[in-house]
Amino acid sequence: MTDALNDEQEVDATLRAVLRDVLGLPEAQVAAFDESSPLFGALPEFDSMAVAGLLTELEERLGILIEDHEVDADMLESFGSLLTFARSKTLQ
């Protein structure tokens, strides 16, 4: 396994843990998320207040900085879009 693959898997696992911890979602629900699983607007737990907590927790756990101008509805739309964003931030 390459370091890049390990890093991608680590970001995936971290994102799932953050979604579980911040939103209070069941482990089984989070484990079942795939790239197309809808998030913002589809999960009642994922409201505007939860977005702030989720992004703060991602910053802390991944050691990244998320700028306000980077946050938009497209990035929060699905598990896949949020995962792609988080992975891109870890590469910067």
For each predicted feature, which ranges?
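Phosphopantetheine-dependent thiolation modules in NRPS/PKS and related acyl-activating systems
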Residues: 2-46, 50-56, 60-92
